[in-house]
């Protein structure tokens, strides 16, 4: 039944990719459930995905980063709940940078221990998708079909440093850690979009993506169910790790639907450094 959901998301990717080329990117006079100003394209993509996913017979409910509450289907005995961010990084569209859709498939309830598959779609010069179950499989659309490019695997140590959050709000220990990576020769690669930045680390073999607790966002900014848990699942299946600085991401509890957390994703070497600094 998972394959039904993945196939539906593949179909959705083609439609969303088309919408991105034709739909207005102007801001609306509305704010989503996470407190972000909405673009017209955010609303259109969210509406499309919600209708598409709620019609799947194996889906009991869905929840979107754009919506306040869980939305239930008529299939009350179905096993799966899908949490998704319909268009992560949509503010980057005007700059013509890559953006994406993030999804997590949960069995029966919304908790990290019930996450059984996850992934993301990246809309850029190429249309690509990563799906994690037993492995993190990488797909690319070639204009006629989706081609399986194989499993992604992180090296033990990488070369990319993608530090999120406003620097003036960082803790001193975090600033020192980021500077130590640059001193080792790590390259700055940060667009402000979670999908392209984490995707680049996976494609290039390793590194560190960080979005720490800051003075203006002590609980972090990124949402557990829609963004952090799905990417943590992908990274672990690719041989990496994800932590909030103290605990493994996929061991965290969820206080509410839009609960957020500090987060660090990367190769084993970078994760060891994070543990040394934060634990």
Swiss-Prot record:
It is found in: Cytoplasm. InterPro entries: FBPase_C_dom, FBPase_class-1, FBPase_N, FBPtase, SBPase. Pathway: Carbohydrate biosynthesis; gluconeogenesis. Its EC number is 3.1.3.11. Mg(2+) 1 binds at residues 65, 85, 87. It catalyses: beta-D-fructose 1,6-bisphosphate + H2O = beta-D-fructose 6-phosphate + phosphate. Gene3D superfamilies: 3.40.190.80, Fructose-1,6-Bisphosphatase, subunit A, domain 1. Its main location: cytoplasm. HAMAP family: FBPase_class1 (MF_01855). Homotetramer. Belongs to the FBPase class 1 family. This is Fructose-1,6-bisphosphatase class 1.
């Amino acid at each position: 039944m998972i394959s039904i959901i993945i196939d539906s998301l593949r179909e959705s990717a083609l439609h969303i990719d088309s919408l991105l080329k034709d739909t207005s990117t102007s801001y609306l006079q509305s704010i989503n459930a996470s407190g972000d100003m909405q673009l017209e394209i955010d609303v259109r993509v969210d509406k499309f995905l919600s209708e598409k996913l709620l019609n799947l017979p194996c889906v009991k409910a869905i929840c979107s980063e754009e919506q306040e509450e869980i939305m239930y289907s008529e299939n009350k005995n179905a096993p799966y709940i899908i949490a998704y961010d319909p268009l992560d990084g949509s503010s980057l569209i005007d700059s013509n940078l890559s953006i994406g859709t993030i999804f997590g498939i949960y069995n029966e309830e919304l908790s990290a221990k019930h996450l059984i598959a996850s992934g993301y779609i990246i809309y850029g010069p190429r249309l690509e998708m990563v799906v994690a179950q037993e492995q993190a499989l990488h797909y690319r659309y070639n204009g006629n079909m989706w081609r399986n490019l194989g499993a992604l695997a992180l090296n033990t140590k990488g070369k990319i440093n993608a530090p999120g959050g406003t620097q003036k709000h960082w803790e001193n220990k975090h600033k020192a850690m980021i500077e130590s990576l640059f001193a080792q020769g790590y390259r700055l690669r940060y667009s402000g979009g979670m999908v392209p930045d984490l995707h680049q680390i996976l494609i290039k073999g390793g590194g560190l993506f960080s979005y720490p607790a800051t003075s203006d966002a002590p609980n972090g900014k990124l949402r557990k169910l829609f963004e952090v848990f799905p990417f943590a699942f992908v990274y672990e299946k690719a041989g990496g790790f994800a932590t909030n600085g103290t605990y493994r991401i996929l061991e965290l509890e969820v206080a509410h639907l839009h609960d957020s957390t500090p987060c660090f994703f990367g190769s084993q070497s970078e994760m060891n450094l994070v543990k040394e600094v934060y634990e």
